């Protein structure tokens, strides 16, 4: 026996789970070999992974046939099995690096982000390699602030923390730095002209372009000066005075030789050479001017220089020792001079300075190294090196530690505070950092950095998710829930819900990151060859191929050790490829087909949307044994029949026919029979006879799209017809909304005997006569039928001689003979009103009357006297004929007499009432017969009546012109009043509109009065009056005037169309009319889509509502008011009869009602008669409201009980258990949706510009519980109104005892209350639509329920749609089934959590029983969309809307679908738990007395034998219902 699915669970798959599903890894992007057309090895269609392409045949063909089943071919590695395994065997792609599942990233709010407390933007920055996320800060500090775990870092920040902060400042060529190499700089300090440091640190020169060596020069030189001028000292510092000359002094040579002159900037040295040898060195201090030049030969005593004033030592020179010899009046000084002599060397880019700034060098030491030894710079003497004009300055955040001896660290080492750096422990680091040993500068630099663990991409997120301690996080968040801030609590709640979802489901957060991507079975993403040798392939193959290519490329790059930036880019591309496979286009631009704009369909696209798996393939499938064709009318058919084209029937019933042909020996076997049918010309007459036999007793289903309600599919008994069109009974057209202007219908054959029986009993057209929405007949006479029946039941009224009085009948007859009185003119004879016809024609029985008509003595419409069923009637032969027709159809003329109103013509409504009364009194079968009779005679009579339309039938009343002239006069008065300033423009406009509205109404009345008095048999009038075609508005436009037209904006043109169509429109009138026509067309198109969508939302919210039990036992009820407040007079008046009927009919009384001496007991189902009785009682002032059970108060979970629902309106009897009342309600509300107007009226008067939403948009607004645009201000408390007027505002105070509430309103607000009025909470103070959410807060759920039902009904009633309240109540109940927790008490619930009222109430019962604090909650009002998405069934919600969001939420919570509603069962292909699929019907055995007795005996025996095993299924009596 097939196992029955009871629940369906959805959860996250772990990487191990994904691998366990897989039959092998897909390693190559290849699909199939284009030459052999066989799948490539390790590719996306590999037979080794996914199974063989042909049944029981391996790839190489070594093993064929079923006997090798299960064997794996040793040659090709393919398992021998059925090829169907290629529909469910999966593969996988092992990712080179983890990738996040986009559903959990991009869902709102992001699931991964919620758990890790990251915003969606932050999470994306990490996943797509824009920022690092810190996994372990390891004491890192950024800009003086400690780095925290999960902090995001930019590339720059990460490099700074990991490798230290450094900045390079390039310098223009030839510009020297303002700081020295190795100098400490601060932020804002100028490093070079125009170059400012942006950070603190150590400045290091990069590539100095110039080196200056300050060579240390020493020289012993002589100087003779006047003794009197000498300033005597042992040594001289730079710039000190040697002598103070009072008069010029010539210094003369003491040796002869060639002069060599050396300039010392502030002095000179003179060398005298004899050949190569220097014979004398003379020092000329500052203040002495040389008198000789380079190369000059001097003799002893020749003046060398002249001194004047002060003689000083140059400022860059010192004289360390001075030897003085006094010779007469002069002194001979020998000075030991020391000075620095700078020398610049250019450094080319290919040369390298190998000494640091300030280094001391000895002669012969290398300063600048170069490849070419010629270019090297060698020190000429002892000196100090200075670096200049660096190409750039590097500022590094580091500590510099000079060392003398051994370095104990190497470059790249990481050190912490206290770690030894050099000199045997003397030099230690004071910070965290990375070591740079600088042997050129003899320092150890510790660049401030940290061994921080921060990463990018999904692997970083996976690591964080793995580390999460959910229990600890739950405790922390529960603490956070106690925070006073509401925003903080709300955020904590959202996080807590996700945390608990993971904890309760057993899912692990890190499973949201994929390590392996599952590959769909190949037959679910096929590749097929199309004409021309090309291949058509599923988009998924392209997406998988892209993913495999990127994955393989990344593996290769990782193996090759590619640079970090390339790896990072490749990882990002891999993440994007995984995203595209799962949900293409969710982030960034979608992947498209090369050369086209069409995005590729990813896994998500395959699931969601109208074309997705759920809606296209699971909730709606194309079925076998079906066909479609154009429909034509079949007036000869019975109500339960349809005409099925022979060829179509042959195909539809082929299997049955083949069997029959074999049985009757038309063919030896099925194969031959099939061949015979395929050759069309071989079909013999006996085959058609066999087909007749096959279809005998069978029904087919006919469906017309759009199927807006359940009557869009009905069962019919097929009748074989020639031709190719399906013939449809005219009376079912209304249910299908079909006409014969080219409509098509589909035919389906129910195959099993169960299906046939169900279709015949429950879906047969003759069994679906009443509308499930209102309980009124749907199969009812219309169009021609009404026309024919109205024609014969109309009576002729004539004017000639009307009102004449006669003493005796003979006198009257004599006057008729003389032509003074017409046959049907009302006259008075002996004080009694009568007519000549009644006196002249007196028949003993109906047959005589009808014979007289046949002989042409009378018309059907003449009033005569007939004896009928023992009564003397004054009526027309036509009415007698009608009574006859009905009597014959129902088989009882007496009953017919009771059903028919003989004294009125039979128009649309009276015929509808006739059908309904017949249904109630005579049942379905006889009603169907009656309908067929009415159809037959209606068509016949409308044909013989000869009613046609000619142009002269549009008769224009004479009064029209008078009314128009009167209107023009009033119009001039209005214009004058406006011009004189008595009216505002708006008031003028309103009055003009009002004037023309009244005028049009007068013209309409004149048209009909004219018809009634002068042309009672006018075809137009007859059609409109009978309800056959046309309405007063259309007749008005034909014969009266078109009246006011609408602008596209919805406002009204103040210029009316005065002409009628009979007269013809002027150009301007035609132009004005065209606006409205176009708007009508646009509205209809929009309306159809909106209406269909609304129906879908309603079905989704209500489909689980099924009648589940007989009585829920509730004591709650609703009171249906019989009176309502009149909008204009503000007084109570009785509601319209039809409104009361749609509120009360078919309901169960919740309390006893006594009125007019009659008692209606509690628990009674209210029939239409009962409702009419209650209306009478209300008129007599004995009843104001009626207490009834309602779905709103029903206590049955996931449904309603029989008592709270009441009648099944389509059967006019109590609803059966298992009836899918939720879907019926949704269809009943949605089906008339297209009829509702789109208009949003612009209201006149003060509040200009405020739109009052009406029609379909208003219905949608109410069902979606939206806050209305033009909102009414409502009172939040009971109290007395006090109004204060300010300069620009109104203040309305509602005052109750010790409390007052103020409402500030604009000055032009339209108030509904006066000073001193008493108002209740929830009562509107101003005009406008009430916000249902505010009403819920002010007055509670009951008030909102009532408001929503009333407001929705208002819209439907305005369009003349009759709809029972209980359908709306079922949907409204679903809108109010959720509550919000305000205080969790002792439960695990959270403040602000939303859940079903049932669950909270059940939990509270448990808590109270355990003596704990119960949960406090407040009711919530949800729109149908939100309510449908909040349902417990994840299958139902996902197949409705927001598929990815629903599945994401369900997966993390590991949700179980209990399969309670209809949709989820349809999706799984189970019988729906409603109707014949409900357990109540399926497990109910129908038994007779004998079987009951046998069961009783068996039970006794069982008890005696004390068998422990209980009977598996309870045996119950079948309850009355529609179940099989």
From Swiss-Prot:
Zn(2+) 2 binds at residues 1112, 1194, 1201, 1204. The keyword Ion transport does not apply. Gene3D superfamilies: 1.10.132.30, 1.10.150.390, 1.10.1790.20, 1.10.40.90, 2.40.40.20, 2.40.50.100, 6.10.250.1410, Molybdopterin biosynthesis moea protein, domain 2. GO terms for biological process: DNA-templated transcription. Keywords: DNA-directed RNA polymerase, Magnesium, Metal-binding, Nucleotidyltransferase, Transcription, Transferase, Zinc. Its cofactor is Mg(2+); Zn(2+). Residues 1502-1524 are annotated as: Disordered. GO terms for molecular function: DNA binding; DNA-directed RNA polymerase activity; magnesium ion binding; zinc ion binding. Its EC number is 2.7.7.6. It holds the Pfam family RNA_pol_Rpb1_4. Zn(2+) 1 binds at residues 58, 60, 73, 76. GO terms for cellular component: DNA-directed RNA polymerase complex. CDD domains: RNAP_beta'_C (cd02655), RNAP_beta'_N (cd01609). It catalyses: RNA(n) + a ribonucleoside 5'-triphosphate = RNA(n+1) + diphosphate. Binds 1 Mg(2+) ion per subunit. DNA-dependent RNA polymerase catalyzes the transcription of DNA into RNA using the four ribonucleoside triphosphates as substrates. The RNAP catalytic core consists of 2 alpha, 1 beta, 1 beta' and 1 omega subunit. When a sigma factor is associated with the core the holoenzyme is formed, which can initiate transcription. Belongs to the RNA polymerase beta' chain family. HAMAP family: RNApol_bact_RpoC. PANTHER family: DNA-DIRECTED RNA POLYMERASE (PTHR19376), DNA-DIRECTED RNA POLYMERASE SUBUNIT BETA (PTHR19376:SF54). This is DNA-directed RNA polymerase subunit beta'.
